[in-house]
Amino acid sequence: MQENLRFASSGDDVKIWDASFLTLVDKFNPHTSPHGISSICWSSNNNFLVTASSSGDKIVVSSCKCKPVPLLELAEGQKQTCVDLNSTSMYLASGGLNNTVNIWDLKSKRLHRSLKDHKCEVTCVAYNWNDCYIASGSLSGEIILHSVTTNTSSTPFGHGSKQPIRHIKYSLFRKSLLGSVSDNGVVTLWDVNSQSSYHTFDSTHKAPASGICFSPVNELLFVTIGLDKRIILYDTSSKKLVKTLVADTPLTAVDFMPDGATLAIGSSRGKIYQYDLRMLKSPVKTISAHKTSVQCIAFQYSTSLTKASLSKGSSNKATAVNKRSVPVSSSSGAAQNSGIVREAPSPSIATVLPQPVTTALGKGSGAAQDEAGLARSKSTDIFSKETDAGKSQDFSSFDDTGKNSLGDMFSPIRDDAVVSKGGDESIGKGDGLDFLPQLNSVFPLRKNAGASSSLVLHSSPLNVLMGSSGKEENESHEPSAESKRAYLGKQEPKDAMKQFTKLISSGAEPGILNTCPSSNQARNLEKFEKPEKDIEAQLIHEPSVNGSSTTVPKAASSVTAGVASSLSEKIVDTLGNSRPGAPLTSVQIRFIQNMIQETLDDFREACHRDIVNLQVEMIKQFHIQLNEMHSLLERYSVNEGLVAEIERLREENKRLRAHF
């Protein structure tokens, strides 16, 4: 197995090149035809190369492990000029001058089947993604789908004899999408399920189109070339031309490198151009490859991706990355859309160029496709601006604001981990949040479960609002044994209230309430008022985002103190009036703790709502200021005098050009 990725080109002979450095590795010619070699394809393990000549003298399978050595010769004298291997490299499809499509069994070295549905010369053949169908195009302008499993052929479809088919190719992602180019320069995308045109690009090439190739990593991108020297990139989703380049010579062959970032294009003058999609103005490298025109270019399959996919057990077939994607399973008689393509696992296409593609796995026949039978795409064009899919539509008006500025400068609330409470509640009480109707669902406030010594951390909405990825911090304090017991024994306030009322009204049993000195009762009350003070202190001195302590205004502090003192008096009065001198039971203790916790939670929610409202209002004002600044800059950046002077100079230049 070769270490470096290679590609083969054919013209007057076959040459194997190092794809990275574009240096010649080997050259050979297993054919005796003076007309050159018209078609080549690699086996899935990159060890063998299949070639066919323009005269159709024979098909040769050569070993390319070390030096190229011809191993097998097929179809001698049968005029086969185009070839394609299936994904297992066990069967070979060929077509040629005798109007037939042949399927060869390479293991037995015999003709497996011969299909005689074409009326004219077959110019190209291609296996589909699961090897169930073979598509073939001919000079009569017809495309026919041959079912390998049922041994039947479809009704011919195409644009007629005025558009002879020169090249066809299946999309690697949209399994039912087939592309074709013809002699009149028309590029057509076909839906093979309905055998109808998905879209036709008329007059894109001013001369015969000679090649088409789909990107192995971008499900939207494909490329065509032609004898008009044009390289045209298309978007299958918007059905538009993305970019057009003009080369120096007529172009005859094209193929994508498996990484999807590099194009190798052959010309009629024997040159091979290497283009980088990230800088398409001119070729990165140019080499003189053949004495005649370059008739075919074929990259090897990515061996690293093949090994990775096989190690995961995703498929029993060898992975053909830049050819087709092998499904996990497929029924032999399934229709061509029986497996859906996994959506591209990588990011959107704007970031996809340097990354290799992973093997797309079929998921079975239940996958959803669009009305034309094509899997819907979530990615964007390779040249498009990357979209932020994680941004909520409600906040789309804030895209221009700074990413981290507001969240770090103005938020006194923690922007890190949240200590959640069992059965947490959302802040559904905020009436002042008309600007963000979904704010309560997007940023739910979570509360502590009852461990009074634990920090209560809140999630600030600002970093989410601005699309930032806030640094997560995990701060947790070990609750004391009393807090743990209180947490385990905690009940809902209503249940605790019922039990407490029942005990008070009916009187406690002798085994439950034991008389103790009044000092014990005072000690217990002091003991359970202490967590309340701790929480109050924690609320006042809650750490801010940057780690420094931010103090809540004194008004909030006084309100907190007033709430706590009134609550304490109410609890003491209630317990003292009910049974003077009796110690607190566990139910009473839980009830008190729940009352304190609920009161503090309500107060905390109110504070949080006020702060969020303030933050939202600040963001609105900043956005208004931003729009005002943009409008003022646009208004005053244009100097009328300079514009008039420029127009005067333009007129003078035109006059001078006309006279001199």
Curated annotation (Swiss-Prot):
Xref: SUPFAM superfamilies: WD40 repeat-like (SSF50978)
Listed SMART domains: WD40
Subunit structure, as described in the record: Interacts with FAM29A. Interacts with HSPA1A and HSPA1B. Interacts with gamma-tubulin in a HSPA1A/B-dependent manner.
Domain of life: Eukaryota
Gene coding for it: Nedd1
Modified residues (Phosphothreonine): 550
Keywords, in A-Z order: Cell cycle, Cell division, Cytoplasm, Cytoskeleton, Mitosis, Phosphoprotein, Repeat, WD repeat
Post-translational modification: During mitosis, prior phosphorylation on Thr-550 by CDK1 promotes subsequent phosphorylation by PLK1 on Ser-397, Ser-426 and Ser-637. Phosphorylated NEDD1 can interact with gamma-tubulin for targeting the gamma-tubulin ring complex (gTuRC) to the centrosome, an important step for spindle formation.
Modified residue annotations for Phosphoserine: 325, 379, 397, 411, 426, 468, 637
WD repeat copies, ranges: 1-31, 32-71, 75-114, 117-156, 160-200, 204-244, 246-285, 289-332
Gene Ontology cellular-component annotations: apical part of cell; centriole; centrosome; ciliary basal body; cytoplasm; cytosol; fibrillar center; gamma-tubulin ring complex
Location(s), subcellular: Cytoplasm, Cytoskeleton, Microtubule organizing center, Centrosome
Name of the protein described by the UniProt record: Protein NEDD1
The keyword Transferase appears for this protein: no
Described purpose of this protein according to its UniProt entry: Required for mitosis progression. Promotes the nucleation of microtubules from the spindle. May play an important role during the embryonic development and differentiation of the central nervous system.
GO process annotations (BP): cell division; microtubule depolymerization; microtubule polymerization or depolymerization; regulation of establishment of protein localization
